[in-house]
């Protein structure tokens, strides 16, 4: 859906895992850098990159360090922030924002903990209502919602765990 808005450019997949988003973005014409702190996932992605002869840097990176070095047109972090240190989230988001070019975009999807959908999973971090939107108050919120969704994880009865997710595509306007 974001591809209807975001034009190909230099992209960073922050917390890429095995590279589903990275590979998709590469197919869409983006110049992607894929980083994660999971070495096994990176090895799997690197083997795909080599098999497909793709020009995609894959690297080990601790997102908690909030030290993205170069600027990107598009920074993607989907279902990643909830696994990071809660006290580092403000710095991580600030670093993402600072390293996004003017006119560039951030795409974030993250679990929430709300009154109507309390988070039953012991994630290190979850957003509260309106919190992600507040971080991006000086950006153009192209898409923003806090809708219910399901995790792949299941509860003790075998049902997929339901909770709200903050989903945001924001454009840096200054």
Feature locations, PLM:
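Class I (Rossmann-like) S-adenosyl-L-methionine-dependent methyltransferase catalytic domain
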Residues: 1-12, 17-67, 84, 88-91, ...
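A conserved beta-strand element that flanks and buttresses the S-adenosyl-L-methionine
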Residues: 76
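Short catalytic micro-motifs in class I SAM-dependent methyltransferases
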Residues: 79-80
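Short, charge-rich binding segments
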Residues: 98
